[in-house]
Every structure is written in structure tokens, then in C-alpha cells.
Amino acid sequence: MSKQLKPVAPKQPIVLGKMGSTYGIRGWLRVFSSTENAESIFDYQPWLIQRSGQWQFVELEDWKRHSQDLIIKVKGIDDRDAANLLTNCEIVVDSEQLPPLEGDDYYWKDLMGCQVVTTSGYELGKVIDMMETGSNDVMVVRANLKDAFGMKERLVPFLHGQVIKKVDLTARVIEADWDPGF
């Protein structure tokens, strides 16, 4: 691992993936990427990990695809025991490193916490999570405490134009054409 100056916590941390189990005896690790294209995780450097409450830079020496997995070699990690200490560490970057999006594309992190309102003005609740279903993304919306339909959570497809009519990130409001009883 890099022996640079002590890194500070990222201003706007975003998790891009996670280090998995060790691979072989020479310090390689599996990587689980959360980026849309798995290999895109390597476009964002430097990586930060948090161990024992301290942030550390991770400098990649090499990476490659092995079967269905991505595996990495971290600089300064040369054996299985050292690599094992990195297992399950989340790979974090500052969200300022992410490229700007165009049109109707949004980073999931920007949708979290937005209030979802129907086109008729009914407040469905707040976005607490996003799911990828294959055909489209789905918002997990936590219903308000006094929901008239007795709902605790709703799954609302994030289909721009069909279901999602307007996204206002400044006001933190998403307008959806969705039946509150569903």
C-alpha cells in the first residue's frame, strides 16, 4: 500500500466496490465492482479504504480479469496474509471524481433522500435505496409514518418519461406517475 501522506476522509465518499477474498499466494485479491461497467472501477484513482477507523490510500500495481472475476494486485501487498487483511474493505473515492452526467441520467447517490411525490401531489415517501433489476432500476421508497394506504415501503420503477415525470435534485423532489396504493 502507498506510504504517502496520511489521507483525510473524502468530503463526499462514495463506495465503488469491495475487496473480496484472496487469490493465490502472491497477494492478489478479488474485487467486486459496483460500477455499471465492472472494469470502470479502475478509472477512479486513488482508491481509499478505511481500516481501524483510519483512511488509507490503495495504489494498484496491476489488475486483470480472471474467469468471471476481477482480481487486483495492491502495491506493497506481496503475500496471502497481507492481502487477507484487506478482505471486505470497501473501495471508496470522493464523489467529485465522478464524471458529470447528461440528460436524464442520475447517480443513485443523488437520488437518495429525495421525496417522491405523485403527479396528483400525494407524498409517497423518501428514496432509501435503489435496486438494479436487469430491465430497469427501481427506487425503494420508505413511506411516511401516516401513510393513508398503510404502506411501509414502495418499489417504484425508475423509468424516466413513463413513471418518472420530473427530477429536481435542487429541491430534492422526484415526481412520479404512480398509484399510491400500489
Curated annotation (Swiss-Prot):
Protein species of origin: Serratia proteamaculans (strain 568)
Keywords linked to the UniProt accession: Chaperone, Cytoplasm, Ribosome biogenesis, rRNA processing
Cellular component terms (Gene Ontology): cytoplasm; ribosome
Pfam families, per the entry: PRC_RimM (PF24986), RimM (PF01782)
Subunit structure as annotated in this protein's UniProt entry: Binds ribosomal protein uS19.
Similarity comment text for this entry: Belongs to the RimM family.
Domain PRC barrel: 103-182
Domain notes from UniProt: The PRC barrel domain binds ribosomal protein uS19.
Subcellular location: Cytoplasm
Molecular function GO terms recorded: ribosome binding
Protein name (record): Ribosome maturation factor RimM
Domain of life: Bacteria
SUPFAM superfamilies associated with the record: PRC-barrel domain, Translation proteins
Record bears the keyword Transport: no
Job of this protein: An accessory protein needed during the final step in the assembly of 30S ribosomal subunit, possibly for assembly of the head region. Essential for efficient processing of 16S rRNA. May be needed both before and after RbfA during the maturation of 16S rRNA. It has affinity for free ribosomal 30S subunits but not for 70S ribosomes.
Keyword rRNA processing found: yes
InterPro entries according to UniProt: PRC_barrel-like_sf, PRC_RimM, RimM, RimM_N, RimM_N_sf, Transl_B-barrel_sf
